[in-house]
């Protein structure tokens, strides 16, 4: 297949970028009073304002031409139909099937996927109801008060983010904790707060062999048995989300408390599956269903809306515009809601593990940029940390601003202040402040000519910095589900345009392989000598401190 950069659509965008580069957004707004209406979308309690981008109507036409030339709609349909679009692992990509209503039949290769999903959801619901009601008791007859999810990557980031985001919707009968890092500090600090008599552990590992997860699970098991003593009690305090029945049973978990999921669910898309058990326990199962319903609603929008009014497609193509035609290498996500403080970290895995690829689907090294670096922190904290670089740095960094219109905590004028900061930042990034404006300000403040000359270059803001603003009527289980699915589909569209496989993650493997080599060397009786001089020296410095 010819490189994307050789296509007519790509070349047209390259030429257009040269034409549009000198344009200032403040000029575009001044010339078009309907610019916001022209470049914004409303959908089910969500507003996407993309008018503060370096685009014209012609830009969007050309970007959508590129999307069509990449056959976005055919690729989308292939994913939704369960075709094995994960080519390197020969797997379907069906996380969207997890959130379909049970009344919607769905089969792949003769397998009734809808029935399989319904069966696991029913198992999850039954378990959640028993835990929440207090029917499920531990080895001393006490009900559970704390849930500890032990997982890593997609088995941690998604559930952790969702439970933090939806904390106001929790039923309040259970505390939830997450342990992911193999650093013993993470587990130790968590266990200090807990009573083994009232703690339930969820061990989330598809293979039940993941090093970090199994190390933490075994240490949690040992901690539990210090009090419970009898290994038979493990079945009352540990459940598993896995497909490895033999390993689960060997650990001491009752097979009836193993919640399965499927190869067609990638880790970073797995919160909708039984990996979301901690979410369902913390919120209650009805709220978990609302989360699924919100994601399904976005799936339907993605599948049915024309490209011109398709929110995931628009956001994806704007990302392509900056990555491939402006040379931008990173993208900031700024949620103006403290409950979404883990959302940027969740998106890091979703986006960077999906689209951080250097070869096309047929194995050819790409000759264009692919995945961007995703990063961010909540506003207004971020304004006092890294917004200096966004406003006056040498890099153009597109940013998404996310704000729920309704707050869950209406304290005084706090939410008004939060919203005013959000809107002000997008305006400031777009407009900037010219030399003339700075000079007028300084003159009005009584500055003399020398002071003005000295300060002027430091106080100029170039502006023309692009942002998308997403307004949610409210952050709740439904809208959060929609928001997550919006970004999932954005990432998918970009992967198709870049002609890469967004659903494998071979880059995770090499470091794990080498760690398995180095681990016994750390514990060996002699110094390491089999690596490069740097790695040998680091291993030996560790050994000298820990073992010598």
Curated annotation (Swiss-Prot):
Classification via Gene3D superfamilies: 1.10.1390.10, Glucose-6-phosphate isomerase like protein, domain 1
Compartments it resides in: Cytoplasm
CDD domains, alphabetized: SIS_PGI_1, SIS_PGI_2
Gene Ontology biological process terms, A to Z: gluconeogenesis; glucose 6-phosphate metabolic process; glycolytic process
Gene Ontology terms, MF aspect: carbohydrate derivative binding; glucose-6-phosphate isomerase activity; monosaccharide binding
Keywords per UniProt: Cytoplasm, Gluconeogenesis, Glycolysis, Isomerase
Active site annotation, chain numbering: 353, 384, 512
SUPFAM superfamilies to which the protein is assigned, alphabetical: SIS domain
E.C. numbers: 5.3.1.9
Signal peptide residue numbers: none
Reactions accelerated catalytically: alpha-D-glucose 6-phosphate = beta-D-fructose 6-phosphate
Pathways involved: Carbohydrate biosynthesis; gluconeogenesis; Carbohydrate degradation; glycolysis; D-glyceraldehyde 3-phosphate and glycerone phosphate from D-glucose: step 2/4
Main subcellular location: cytoplasm
Pfam families: PGI (PF00342)
Domain of life: Bacteria
GO cellular component, one term: cytosol
Biological role stated in the UniProt entry: Catalyzes the reversible isomerization of glucose-6-phosphate to fructose-6-phosphate.
Family: Belongs to the GPI family.
The protein's name in its UniProt record: Glucose-6-phosphate isomerase
Organism: Chlorobium chlorochromatii (strain CaD3)
Gene responsible for this protein: pgi
């Amino acid at each position: 297949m010819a490189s994307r950069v050789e296509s007519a659509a790509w070349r047209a965008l390259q030429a257009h970028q040269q034409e549009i580069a000198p344009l200032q957004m403040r000029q575009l707004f001044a010339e078009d009073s309907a610019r916001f209406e022209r470049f914004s979308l409303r959908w089910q309690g969500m507003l996407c304002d993309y008018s503060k981008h370096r685009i014209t109507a012609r830009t969007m036409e050309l970007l959508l031409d590129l999307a069509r030339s990449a056959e976005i709609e055919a690729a989308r349909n292939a994913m939704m139909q369960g075709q094995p679009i994960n080519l390197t692992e020969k797997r379907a990509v069906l996380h969207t099937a997890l959130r379909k209503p049970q009344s919607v039949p769905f089969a792949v290769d003769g397998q009734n996927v809808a029935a399989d999903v319904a069966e696991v959801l029913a198992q999850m619901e039954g378990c959640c109801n028993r835990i929440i009601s207090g029917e499920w008791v531990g080895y001393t007859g006490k009900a559970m008060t704390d849930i500890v999810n032990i997982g890593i990557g997609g088995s941690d980031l998604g559930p952790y983010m969702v439970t933090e985001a939806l904390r106001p919707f929790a039923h309040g009968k259970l505390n939830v904790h997450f342990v992911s890092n193999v650093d013993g500090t993470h587990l130790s600090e968590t266990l200090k707060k807990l009573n083994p008599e009232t703690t339930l552990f969820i061990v989330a590992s598809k293979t039940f062999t993941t090093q970090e997860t199994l190390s933490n699970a075994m240490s949690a098991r040992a901690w539990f048995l210090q009090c419970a003593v009898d290994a038979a009690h493990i079945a009352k305090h540990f459940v598993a989300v896995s497909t490895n029945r033999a390993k689960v049973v060997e650990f001491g978990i009752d097979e009836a408390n193993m919640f399965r999921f499927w190869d067609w669910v990638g880790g970073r898309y797995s919160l909708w599956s039984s990996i979301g058990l901690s979410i369902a326990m913390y919120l209650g199962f009805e709220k978990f269903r609302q989360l699924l319903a919100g994601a399904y609603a976005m799936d339907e929008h993605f599948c049915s809306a024309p490209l011109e009014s398709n929110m995931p497609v628009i956001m994806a193509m704007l990302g392509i515009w900056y990555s491939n035609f402006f040379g931008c290498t990173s993208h900031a996500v700024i949620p103006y809601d403290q409950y979404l403080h883990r959302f940027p970290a969740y998106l890091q895995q979703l986006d960077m593990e999906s689209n951080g690829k250097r070869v096309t689907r047929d194995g050819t090294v790409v000759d264009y940029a692919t995945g961007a670096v995703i990063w961010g922190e909540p506003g207004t904290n971020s304004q006092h940390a890294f917004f200096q670089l966004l406003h006056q740095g040498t890099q153009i960094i597109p940013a998404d601003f996310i704000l729920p219109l309704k707050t869950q905590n209406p304290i005084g004028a706090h939410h008004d202040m939060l919203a005013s900061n959000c809107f002000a930042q997008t305006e400031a990034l777009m407009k900037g402040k010219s030399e003339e404006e700075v000079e007028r300000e300084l003159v009005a403040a009584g500055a003399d000519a020398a002071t003005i000359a000295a300060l002027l270059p430091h106080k100029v803001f170039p502006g023309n910095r692009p942002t998308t603003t997403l307004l949610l009527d409210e952050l709740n289980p439904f809208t959060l589900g929609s928001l997550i699915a919006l970004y999932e589909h954005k990432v998918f569209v970009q992967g198709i345009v870049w002609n890469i496989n967004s659903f494998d993650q071979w880059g995770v493997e090499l470091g794990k392989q080498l760690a398995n080599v180095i681990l016994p060397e750390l514990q060996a009786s002699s110094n390491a000598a089999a690596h490069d001089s740097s790695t040998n020296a680091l291993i030996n410095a560790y050994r000298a401190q820990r073992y010598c």
